[in-house]
Amino acid sequence: MVLVSETPSSAHLRWAYMDHWRVETPQGPVSQYTSVAHFDRFLKQIAAVGFEAIETFDFHLGVLRELFGSLEKCRDFMQERGVERVLSLFHAVMYDERQSMPHVPATHDRMFNYARYIMESSRGLGVENFIVMPAGLYYDVEPVTDEKIRACADLWNRIGQMTQDYGIRTCCHHEFFCGIRSAAEIEKFYEWTDPRYVFFYCDTAQHVIAGVDPVELYRKLHARCGGFHFKDTQNVDRTEDYRRRPDAEIMAPTTPRWFWEMGAPQGLVDFPALARAMKQCGYRGWVSVEHDKADVGAGNYPESTALAAWYRKHVFERIYA
């Protein structure tokens, strides 16, 4: 992201795809990481609708190395199909106060060392962002206190400084069930983190579900915005589903499907307002499209991806241009 004085145009945005992809087969849902052939078809489909990079979880690093022999060869394979890089790795650490919990300082050394291991393990893919949930699950953190938020800030300042040595930004992504979820908690967290080392990753649907306006939040934090996850939702959590164990996204009895592709009917994210805000604030760079659990209720990932790409091209980019 670069702040500039001249007016941006849609040519200043590049589009990435945050990977939750699965396809239905007679054997059930199949991931693209099961074979080179599946990965090939996945890359060609997303490239065909205008995505130039992917984001994925860091636990896929070993699989990609096994499929292609090295991450450099994997990136060559991707580029031959029109996908430039793995833009971001989402850190899939299992938060546990015994060994990895951001608000527990005794676990910080282990978390730091694991993050450094991911940095070393990801060389060759062109990664630019290390995306993290900055606190544990809400029910593991509550009551959320200033002391706990400061402890989280201390950890990510330390890790963020280290990832800069690898040319990678540490970006914080606030799920609606995260221990740092409200506007007040988020404001404190970014006040107590170093803007040189810790960046904000704006997930539009997650903030809406948590009762936070992502457009207003982006305007406040635009100078620290490392990127976006564009997805929509039709629901705000009004019954404290964020406290559901073990996974609020799948255990909430009120909401069978939290996430939808941008432009979906009854969507609550104001993407036109966000496009105007990004234009006014001079945002340039990568934007990621995501549709987590798109296959709930007989949906599918290829369809959601194509619908989001249509909205991106025919609605969002025309406003931003």
Give residue spans per PLM region.
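N-terminal pre-domain/capping segments
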Residues: M1-V127, E147, N157, P195, ...
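Acidic/histidine-rich catalytic cores of soluble enzymes
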Residues: P8-H12, W21, Q27-P29, A53-I54, ...
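A cross-family glycoside hydrolase active-site/sugar-binding cleft signature
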Residues: A16-H20, E55-F57, V86-H91, F130-P134, ...
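Acidic-and-aromatic substrate-binding clefts and catalytic sites of carbohydrate-active enzymes
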Residues: S31-V36, F57-L71, M94-Q99, D109-M111, ...
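Helix C-cap/helix->beta junction micro-motif
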Residues: E80-G82, L125, D165-Y166, R196, ...
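Active-site groove signature of glycoside hydrolases
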Residues: I118-P143, Y166-E175, S288-V289
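Active-site cleft segment of glycoside hydrolase catalytic domains centered on the general acid/base Glu
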Residues: Y139-W156, M162
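A short, acidic, amphipathic alpha-helical segment used as a generic capping/interface helix at domain edges
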Residues: P265-Q280
